[in-house]
Amino acid sequence: LEETLEIENSQRNKFKGGDEFVIHILYLNGEFEDNNNALGIAYKGSSFAMFQEKIEDAAFLFISAQDIEKAVLVHEYGHLLGLVNMGYTSPHDHEDPNHPHHSNNEESVMYWAIESQDFYNQLDGEPPNNFDSYDLDDLNLMRQGKL
């Protein structure tokens, strides 16, 4: 993670300010040293990294690298928004107890395995790339200041 932070610090020139929210996305070669199956990681409040080679390696006949990339982008963005139970407690019981800050719903883009290369070997169609109803409700309640 230290190397990722160094790369961001050398490249990033836009930050949030006023009403502007800025997201910094790094596309990196190689892999995350703490989990070599990770396809992406959210590592700061407005930053996440995508491991392009790992995403391409996860693609196969039925699932394109573009579909995987889209799912991982939305998943990591969800973490930046606070999903699941990051700094709040959801009124819905949808956090996977074995994978904190991830959904227990395989149809949600916040499902824990979305960011893992192993997950895509088990699919026979497009991966989820949208938030489920509980994720959307949590985001709505956060927007309203109720969480």
Residue positions per predicted region:
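Active-site-proximal segments of metallohydrolase catalytic domains
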Residues: 1-53
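Residue-identity detector for glycine
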Residues: 17-18, 30, 40, 45, ...
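The catalytic-center signature of Zn2+-dependent metalloproteases
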Residues: 56, 60-136
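Ser/Thr-centered flexible coil motifs
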Residues: 1-5, 132-137
